[in-house]
From Swiss-Prot:
Source organism per UniProt: Schizosaccharomyces pombe (strain 972 / ATCC 24843) (Fission yeast)
Cytoplasmic side: 1-19, 71-193, 239-391, 448-895, 941-958, 1027-1040
Protein name: Cation-transporting ATPase 5
UniProt keyword Phosphoprotein present: yes
Residues annotated as catalytic: D480 (4-aspartylphosphate intermediate)
Transmembrane segments: 20-41, 48-70, 194-216, 221-238, 392-412, 426-447, 896-915, 923-940, 959-982, 1004-1026, 1041-1060, 1076-1096
Cited NCBIfam families: ATPase_P-type (TIGR01494), P-ATPase-V (TIGR01657)
GO cellular component, one term: endoplasmic reticulum
Name of the gene: cta5
Keyword check for Amino-acid biosynthesis: no
Intervals, Lumenal compartment: 42-47, 217-220, 413-425, 916-922, 983-1003, 1061-1075
Length: 1096
């Protein structure tokens, strides 16, 4: 549910004219994952007029800047106010992103009554934010989203004969005005709009200004090349944006016709015309996608919910029979509700008859539906800038400050020599374009782009490119167990049933079930075949893999169900088994779906001969034992469960109960009443084999000093067994298992067991042993269930929880929300966390993690950072390697671009002192034939083959990097200064005199600094790109080696080439003394050596 928190802010100067007495800041929770802050503002007319005049005088430049920085527009022309006078609202989210939305008005023809407030007829103010409309509630002056679920409930309960009549035309028109339609249409941007958005980006505008400066300085050819490269880059960006937009619209799809009951008749309308409270009519002829979130009112149906929940197993939905508000809210707000049908889910089967059609009441439409939320996430992704990007922007600001200091110095210096004003401006701006490389942030994404390409070729797709850098600095990785570390397939190992003589459990192997059914009692067959989730779609059996295994192992058969029109509660489906024979048919009347909290599922059925009702239930042993009568529980059950769990088996307990209450009354009884005082019957023992690659991946992560944890919904000892056999516990000698003992005290009683991993034996626990003893003991790890973890979080101190997290290796009985909570907890304590799951119950944790690797490709798993099409756990290894590779390449590209800018700035600085400059072809040679190819080749290094214990630094300013950059910058300046000094002191040649209006571009000093700079560009590249444990060996990258060799030979050739050679004439290289040429070459080699030493 949405929630609101209001904060009253008192202005500092309450007597200031025009200042309201109270300022209202509103904190609003749109959902559990989306929170915004809303602050109202109003315009100051005089300041608005001044700003518009200024925007005109600056030819729109100021308007463009304020478009990039909307918060500055607010500060200049808007004043904070109360919601009574609001004209604009400033929206902020926890990531720091802000936006300004205009407040509009709508004229309501009638009052709109909701459960918590009333929107009166007349003028009502609202604003739209990311496809959601917020209304100003007039009584408390609060911004609110319309409460769809409660409003839909009011419509259903207040409409006379709702099931027969549906909504009337008047109500539909009133609802559409306020709640909006069911449209998910997002206006497609034209190519021109996308192009303008790209061109008006600060990066390309800076490029455009730079090109104008270069053209004024007669660098025509160089400018044309930059324009061509930038145009191609813009083309690629526009193409990518358009393709992304088309992908989103393909998910939305075209509006489909649906049947709806309105004004007492069935009508066919487009799905876009639906409103909350509408009554949809579906039949088996309408096996299509549901366009809204709705509550099922009659009949039952089988759905493919993979798009919304990520669950690959089809889900059966049942009608909501309890019409209370509490039941309605639980059904409509719980994503796993058995009565809720999500928008975007596909009907596989509808069990409807003319007397009981499939009727669905609409509770959420448009972007408020679950599919709408998915589309909103795609349209407005939560783009948190990486630390690397933020660091590069900070460094750009530093470079900008340095450039302005240099501009002032150059301007003063040139004025001393009576240079013209135009020449001073041109040289000053030229310094700015050299020292502040606008492509610096873009170079950080080159390594990411190459990593994405390599991952795509390996069938690993990313939905969050910025997460690749996060993958390079993970410290903790969490794995789901079932379907991730183990195979999806489940095999029945054996069955334990009660012995007739003494009531103890006895074992029956799975191989003998089909040979001699008398070894088992009838309940094992009946529970196994009377399944809750199985369906026969066509000729294919679909459902939970565990139930499919039990059904087929016990020779279950689906039977045709005869639905009598006069039967008030027809069966959902019917089955038979080999024990009772084909003549004994079991009809399932009610299915209590698997509940992750209760950890069990049940069915109510009857036989075709006795017609007596029975309840069969199965689930986690502790869950079934908790509802079983004490006299039915064998005395050796705990011993058997403990032994089997320690061997890694998955245990499902089952029980039964004879029901004497009539069916029409049973249907309305609560689950807790039905599932009570059952008779315990036995245990199904199953096993899921480990994936072949699980142990290799886990071992590699542990060798790289990464913390590895396993989260599972299975029992504690089963999870520990899997963790041990996949190598997750190899780094410790002992493990402690901790379980919460039943106790009514506020302080929980914890039962510990100590296991020696070398001998596989249980060790004695001393008296008075506590959790703090485990925390303090070295070489040990801790395993516990989710229930105990939640209790401990409320009891332990900050430091104790931190140590606890470092020792936790296995977490059992974890619900989907428990997994996400554990990931969030690790992040809270400073860990970068990765999570790998199969998508079924892991969507929340996958989204919460810094890096989520999904082994499912359903649409719901778009929340994961990476999706494996091969569904292989080895892809975790590939993602981590690519993350480290892209991170180190981004560091190197950043360092290279910065040092190249300093080399070029240092060179032109010493040339400007004589009013000299590089010529057009020299700039072109340095930038496009040396810097650009080398920076591109640098970014194409492949990742290393193995993970190492070291991790690359996530920040650009760590481990003395700034100090190294500073030292290298000083060395560059000293080398250029020394070269200039040598030329002056030796007096080998006479330099041209100062020219007032034009810089000299052909003389010995220009040639010398050009040759030295060219050598330094190559030397810096070689010095930076040394062997790294995160990258493949340099010699394997033949393109890079060949390019460096070619550029090096070209530079040596230029040092000694005759000035009359065609290349020398093209680059305007003048004649140099031979010794001086050797000095230049020597200084270039020394620069390379010093750079290499500093980067070791």
């Amino acid at each position: 549910m949405d929630s609101i928190e209001l904060k009253q802010l008192v202005p500092e100067n309450d007597s200031e004219p025009g200042t309201p007495r109270q300022l209202l800041f509103q904190h609003y929770d749109i959902s559990n994952e989306e929170t915004i802050g809303i602050k109202p503002f109003k315009s100051i007319p005089a300041k608005v007029y001044i700003l518009r005049v200024t925007e005109i005088l600056t030819l729109g430049l100021l308007h463009l800047i304020l478009t990039w920085l909307p918060e500055f527009r607010l500060k200049w022309i808007e004043a904070p106010c109360s919601n009574e006078d609001v004209e604009f609202v400033a929206i902020s989210d926890p990531s720091g992103t802000s936006s300004i939305e205009k407040v509009s008005s709508i004229c309501l023809k009638n009052d709109i009554q909701t459960s918590s407030f009333v929107l009166p007829s007349g003028k009502t103010r609202y604003f739209e934010y990311k496809k959601l409309r917020f209304y100003l509630e007039p009584l408390n002056l609060q911004w609110v989203l319309m409460p769809l679920e409660t409003s839909a409930y009011s419509l259903v309960t207040s409409t006379p004969a709702y099931i027969q009549n549906g909504l009337d035309t008047f109500t539909i028109a009133k609802l559409r005005q306020v709640y909006g339609s069911n449209s998910l249409v997002s206006t497609k941007k034209s190519i021109v709009t996308i192009l303008l958005n790209e061109v008006l980006h600060p990066f390309y505008l800076f490029q455009a200004v730079s090109v104008l400066i270069w053209l004024c300085d007669s660098f025509v050819f160089y400018s044309c090349c930059i324009v061509f490269i930038s145009s191609y880059s813009i083309f690629l960006s526009v193409k990518e944006s358009k393709e992304s937009e088309n992908r989103i619209h393909s998910i939305i799809g075209a509006p489909q016709p649906v049947t709806v009951i309105r004004n007492q008749v069935k009508q066919t309308v487009l799905a876009d015309d639906l409103v909350i409270g509408d009554l949809l009519y579906f039949s088996n002829l309408d096996l299509k996608t549901c366009p809204v979130d709705g509550i099922l009112f009659s009949s039952s149906c089988l759905l493919d919910e993979s798009m919304v929940t990520g669950e690959s197993v089809p889900a059966r939905k049942f009608p909501l029979e309890d019409n209370s508000l509490d039941s309605w809210m639980i059904a409509s707000c719980n994503i796993f509700s058995p009565h809720l049908i999500h928008a975007g889910t596909k009907f596989l089967k509808i069990d409807s008859t003319p007397s009981t059609p499939c009727l669905i009441s609409v509770v959420r439409t448009g972007f408020r539906s679950n599919k709408g939320q998915l589309i909103r996430n795609l349209l407005y992704p939560n783009l948190r800038p990486s630390q690397l990007y933020l660091d590069s922007m900070s460094f750009l600001k530093t470079m900008a400050i340095l450039s302005f200091v240099s501009i002032v110095f150059i301007a003063i210096y040139l004025n001393l020599y009576n240079a013209s004003f135009g020449h001073v401006v041109l040289r000053s701006l030229d310094v700015l374009t050299i020292l502040v490389p606008p492509a610096l942030p873009a170079t950080l994404s080159v390594g990411i782009a190459n990593s994405i390409a390599r991952l795509s070729r390996a069938l690993i797709y990313t939905t969050s490119p910025e997460s690749i850098h996060n993958a390079g600095c993970l410290s903790t990785f969490v794995f789901d167990k079932t379907g991730t570390l183990t195979e999806n397939s489940v095999q029945l190992s054996c069955v334990y049933v009660k012995s007739g003589s003494n009531g103890l459990l006895k074992q029956v192997d799975a191989d003998s079930l089909s040979l001699d059914s008398t070894k088992l009692n009838a309940h094992a067959y009946r529970v196994a075949t009377c399944s809750q989730s199985l369906e026969l779609v066509g000729n294919e059996l679909v459902g939970d893999p565990l139930e499919v295994t039990l059904f087929t192992q016990f020779n279950g058969t689906f039977c045709a169900t005869i639905r009598a029109s006069n039967t008030p509660h027809p069966p959902l489906f019917s089955v038979s088994n080999s024990f009772d024979g084909p003549s004994q048919i079991f009809s399932i009347y009610k299915a209590l779906e698997f509940d992750p909290v209760l950890r069990r599922m049940s069915v109510i059925c009857s036989t075709s001969t006795e017609r007596s009702l029975m309840l069969f239930t199965k689930g986690a042993p502790e869950s079934i034992l908790a509802i079983s009568s004490q006299q039915s529980i064998p005395s050796n059950v705990q011993e058997v469960i403990h032994t089997l769990s320690s061997k890694g088996f998955r245990i499902i307990a089952f029980a039964s109960k004879n029901l004497i209450t009539p069916l029409q009354e049973l249907i309305h009884l609560s689950r807790s009443t039905l599932e009570s005082n059952v008779t315990f019957q036995g245990l199904f023992v199953l096993e899921s084999p480990l994936r072949e690659s699980s142990k290799d991946v886990i071992s590699s992560l542990l060798r790289s000093k990464m913390e590895v944890s396993i989260c599972s919904g299975d029992s504690l000892f089963t999870s520990v067994f899997v963790a041990k056999h996949c190598g997750a516990l190899d780094s410790c000698n002992f493990i402690y298992t901790a379980e919460l003992a039943d106790s009514g005290d506020d302080c929980p009683q914890i039962h510990f067991e100590k296991i020696d991993l070398q001998t596989q034996n249980f060790q004695p626990i001393p008296d008075g042993f506590s959790l703090k003893d485990v925390i303090l003991e070295k070489d040990s790890s801790l395993c516990m269930d989710g229930k105990l973890l939640q209790r401990l979080l409320t009891m332990l101190s900050f430091n104790e929880i931190k140590i606890l997290l470092s020792k936790l290796r296995v977490l059992a009985r974890m619900s989907p929300f428990d997994k996400a909570t554990y990931v969030e907890l690790c992040q809270k304590y400073g860990c970068k966390v990765g999570f790998c799951g199969d998508g079924a119950n892991d969507c929340i944790a996958l989204k919460q993690a810094d890096v989520g690797v999904s082994l499912s490709d359903s649409e719901a798993c778009a929340a994961a950072s990476f999706v494996s099409k091969k569904k292989s756990i080895k892809d975790v290894f590939n993602v981590l390697l690519e993350g480290r590779c892209s991170l180190i390449l981004s560091h190197r590209c950043f360092q290279y671009m910065v040092l190249c800018a300093i080399v070029q700035f240092s060179g032109v600085f010493f040339l400007y002192l004589k009013n000299y400059n590089f010529n057009d072809n020299q700039f072109l040679f340095m930038d496009l034939l040396i810097i650009f190819p080398l920076s591109a080749a640098m970014s194409y290094f492949d990742p290393a083959q193995n993970l190492t214990s070291n991790r690359p630094n996530s920040t650009l300013f760590g481990k003395g990097r700034v100090k190294d950059l500073g030292i290298q910058s000083v060395l560059i300046w000293l080398s250029h200064g020394l070269l200039t000094l040598i030329l002056h002191e030796l007096n080998w040649v006479e330099l041209p005199e100062w020219q007032l209006e034009k810089s000299n571009t052909k003389n010995v000093l220009v040639t010398s600094i050009f040759l030295l700079s060219s050598l330094q560009y190559l030397g810096i590249c070689i010095g930076i790109n040394q062997s790294s444990e995160f990258l493949s060996p340099i010699w394997k990258k033949k393109t890079y080696v060949c390019l460096c060799t070619t550029i090096g030979l070209c530079n040596i050739y230029l040092c000694f080439a005759n000035e009359n050679h065609i290349i020398s004439r093209c680059l305007q290289i003048t004649r140099l003394p031979t010794l001086y040429r050797f000095i230049i070459l020597f200084m270039g080699v020394i620069s390379c050596c010093l750079t290499s030493i500093l980067n070791m």
